[in-house]
Regions:
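A broad, low-specificity signal marking well-ordered, structured residues that form hydrophobic/aromatic
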Residues: 33, 46, 68, 97, ...
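A contiguous pocket-lining binding segment that forms or flanks enzyme active sites
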Residues: 109-155, 169
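Active-site-adjacent beta-strand/loop module that shapes the phosphate/pyrophosphate-binding cleft
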Residues: 31-42, 141-162
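Short loop segments at secondary-structure junctions
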Residues: 40, 61-64, 73, 154-160, ...
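A positional/architectural concept
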Residues: 1-63, 73
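Conserved Nudix-box catalytic region and its N-terminal flanking loop in Nudix hydrolases
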Residues: 46-49, 58, 63-117, 139, ...
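Nudix hydrolase/Nudix homology domain
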Residues: 2-19, 95, 134, 144, ...
Length: 215
């Protein structure tokens, strides 16, 4: 079954022999913390990670009747399968299918502005905050970091495409066009590693715009 208008790359860009893991004593993105607290006269502790919040946007291109999503290598997913769980039998290579997204790391910019920047950098569409509709805000990794993600939706057209996308600096992001008519089947297919935000945003769209006819 073909879920995509374009064909996703089947070849990993990561050399398995080059991968190694080591303890992390410091990071620009996370801090390891331990909370001490009293709950109903019981002293407790909880280890957690201080991390940045994020934004993500579901892009829907009208002409193609497709959701524009991204595929990229996630080291944590790779390590989970090959180092922590040792379940190499699963069809997981560390690449995940996700919404266009980014960290909230620019104090002088609004969440909407950051979301628009990510749409341009990752997918090549130049949109503005007026294009965005808020889907909602959701906490992720509630037992580990409690980071907050704000989800947006934007209806786009081909004339907003100004570059091929793919990310900036050393990012290797693949832009994919997921057929709206196949989106539910894609969500249910466990052979494709995907994020909760991607599935939630697509389900939100399909419910809100259930009367849209396929192009």
């Amino acid at each position: 079954m073909s879920y995509f208008k374009n064909i996703p790359s089947q070849q990993s860009l990561v050399h398995h022999a080059s991968v190694s893991l080591e303890p992390c004593s410091s990071s620009h993105y996370i801090e390891l913390k331990r909370m001490h607290y009293n709950e109903e006269n019981t002293e407790k502790t909880w280890d957690m990670i201080k991390s940045l919040d994020s934004v993500a946007v579901l892009l829907y291109e009208k002409e193609s009747d497709c959701f524009v999503i991204v595929k990229q290598f996630r080291p944590a997913i790779y390590a989970r399968h090959f180092y922590f769980k040792f379940d190499q039998d699963q069809n997981i290579d560390g690449y995940t299918y996700e919404l266009c997204a980014g960290l909230v790391d620019k104090a002088n910019k609004s969440l909407e502005e950051i979301a628009c920047e990510e749409a341009l950098e990752e997918c090549g569409y130049e949109i503005s905050p007026k294009h965005l509709e808020t889907i909602g805000q959701f906490y992720s990794a509630t037992g580990l970091s409690g980071s907050l993600q704000t989800l947006y939706y934007a209806e786009i057209s081909a004339n907003l495409k100004v570059s091929k996308g793919g990310g900036i600096d050393t990012e290797k992001i693949e832009v994919l066009f997921l057929k709206r008519s196949k989106a539910l089947d894609f969500i249910a297919d466990f052979q494709y590693a995907k994020t909760t935000g991607l599935s939630l945003a697509i389900l939100w769209h399909l419910k809100k715009f259930k009367n849209i006819k396929n192009v």
